[in-house]
Amino acid sequence: MSEHKTFYITTPIYYPSDKLHIGHSYTTVACDALARFKRMQGYDVMFLTGTDEHGQKIQDKAADAGVTPKEYVDKIVATVKDLWKLMDISYDRFIRTTDDYHMESCQKIFTKLYEQGDIYQGEYTGHYCKLCESFWTDSQLVDGKCPECGREVYDAHEEAYFFKTGKYADRLLKLYEENPQFIQPESRKNEMIAFIKQGLQDTCVSRTSVKWGIPVPFDPKHTMYVWVDALSNYISALGYGNEKYDEYSKFWPADLHMVGKEILRFHTILWPAMLMALDLPLPKRVFGHGWLLMNGGKMSKSVGNVVDPVILCDRYGVDAIRYFLLREIPFGNDGTFTNEALINRINSDLANDLGNLLSRTVAMCEKYFGGTVHKVAGTEAIDTELETMTSELLGKVTADMDNLTIPQALMEIFAVIQRANKYIDETAPWALAKDEANKERLESVLYHLCEALRVAGILLNAYLPSTAPKMMEQLGLDASAIDVEKAAYGVQESYTVHKGEALFPRIDVAKEIAHLKEEDEKRKAAAEAAKKAKEEAEKKAAAPAEESNVDFTHEAEISYDDFCKVELRVAEVRACENLKESKKLLHLTVFDGERERCILSGIAKWFKPEDLIGKKLGIVCNLAPRPMMKGKYVSEGMIFAADTADGGCSIPFYSDDTPVGARIH
């Protein structure tokens, strides 16, 4: 393969409003398999993934958590990277839309489009879905709700900048007609054509009501609408509009954008229209895959019907989960996740077919030939089908991967594995071993099995990157054997096998389903309790205040500027003790995210020291140090506390997931 042969593949950049679920893993594992396969073919691959970190939803989530938006997304992004490491995702670059170089590129793109007249200022009046970050007209709503997610929308009216999407309607239709591979699957293309023909509206590309975003450089009261920001990542990550990288000319245009069907419209209408306006090449293919369903509905963080991939990987192994996602879901259509389907796929394909074939073959090689078998001249008619299937496998898998029919590629590989298992039954090696005259024939049979396993292992490396090397090791081969140029029958002259652990231990279906059902019930109960607690809190907050004997004497009014000088933060109590010198005071040592400080507080009457240690509470942390107890102690702040109706004292504590040092607003 020549050095200039490149392949650029991208996942959507994920929205880090919460931890990712198995549906996100599905997209990323599919891209990873394609990237790995192209590398095996000798391509210079750029595999891009990342996170889309701006927008109203994250701004609101951060405010609820009492942290800045950047602090909020930093925490989630760390879990995203940990997940991809766990799942053996071999990405080459991870982009964050909060990266300085990306913001530089976006501002240059926005300015260029404005200066050439493709972006103009106006006013937006219509409807907005916060969950989908989408604007909608009256005619686009379905029963008054968002046509994408079915949730409530709210009326929006604000000054905004617009991109002239409608200007490019005819060019987009021509693009689809002249490049039938541009949108896949075919059914998705028909949806986009219908959307354009109903009248393509210009696109709102800025907000004044959302501050968490990339500022419009020539009008900083506006921030860029999230889709313009997010879509530009595919070229900013290569160095377009910035000096961070210099790979735009090498890798652009992208060979494949892989996205969920719910964001296909932005990638096949808005994105190519922007590129047309910038006079840049268009991506070669955009594939809109289906949803991973659970209990009849799309998995969604906001709905809560999600499956944690970390839990699945810990219990069943990473490659088992990768295989299930790639094999079980019809690529391009919706697929359903169930515990039963997962376990049955592991048992049937991985444990019974693949695992048993390897263990039986290795065991027979050791039993009958001391572990070493050689290529034997001549074959019999019964060998021909297995030889042919093994030699033709690379071509079939290559065609399937080029066509993005990933499940079919795995079916082809496992067809060889299943044929090899059948070949054992047909040739009956145990019977051949009873007669010394059949020794050469027995060796030929075992060699055929080793060859089928070797070729299957080479190709499985793209999908099961931990399993393929284990297969090679048991066949007595090293990592250099995983080479597609060697993926044909008869290449390896001999084998010296080494018995290893079972690749995929068989699962007791009844016991496992019972366990998973119990765990599901626990999670549902916890979710229901959390929902109920939230509803109670909202109900209590909305209820009219009861009469009380609280003292409503007010202090003198202070200015807003004076109040802004007060620094309020969440602190954790590291130590607490009573003072011998005072029955009223407790001596607290708290950590405010930067340092430990001492605070003396008159709450000893109501709180025991051991009840406060480890708790998170609010403090005023920029008070001037105050000497107390005749200078023996210095108090460096105050804690939040409230008088109760019965003359007692109450302290508001913060939850475990509230970061120490978070600002209190």
Summary of predicted features, one role per range:
Residues M1-E3, F37-D44, A65, P69, ...:
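Secondary-structure transition/capping motifs at alpha-helix termini
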Residues S2-I76, I95-F110, E115, C132, ...:
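N-terminal catalytic cores of NTP/NDP-binding nucleotidyl/phosphoryl-transfer enzymes
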Residues S2-T49, Y101-S105, C149, D155-K367, ...:
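Structured secondary-structure scaffolds
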Residues I76-D92:
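A glycine-rich helix N-cap at a beta->alpha junction
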Residues Q116-A169, L173:
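Cys/His-rich short segments
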Residues Q121, H127, E328, A341-G378, ...:
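Helix-rich, typically C-terminal accessory recognition domains appended to large enzymatic cores
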Residues A468-D562:
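Intrinsic disorder at enzyme termini
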Residues A542-H665:
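Phosphate-backbone binding interfaces of nucleic-acid-interacting proteins
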